[in-house]
């Protein structure tokens, strides 16, 4: 009989301990985080964000400039190929004005219309002749934060060119490829029917931190260079 009472007493103690443990767990779960803990976590997250965001912005900025420089280099390669394949003139038309988004585009000389037309335009008509910097729908816009320019740099990136300057202006309105009048705020590298540039020249792009140059000589060799925007430190890219 005494043994039964002891066993019952032990079971009661165990049951009370279990109930107490469950109550403790519930109280801990209901308590949540204190205000100090929340503030500490927010402070840590703020510090991490402050460290990470500028780096991410630099990556995006570099990617935009790199991408535009690569694309304008590809446009030059396409223009050179078009000129040789079609036995006509071809050019990369680069708009550097500030009244609208800056852009570049490949044009070809149409021997039927005797005017420049956008490359890839099916069945061009007289109304498609390029005489101004108006957009045609075949442009590649420069990325946000990227523009044509070279800052204060004056040292040439290569002996392909003799000065740091955008290539010569684009011709329009003439009866031959290199006649008419030059379109304001434009820069063109033109290839003749043999695929050679009519003159050495280059395109310069900057984001204010770095400058990219894509230059060509009269033999048709093209190279890309990059430099810090503040001090000339050109190296091949």
Question: Predicted regions span which residues?
Answer:
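N-terminal helix-rich module
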Residues: 2-25, 33-36, 47-77, 81, ...
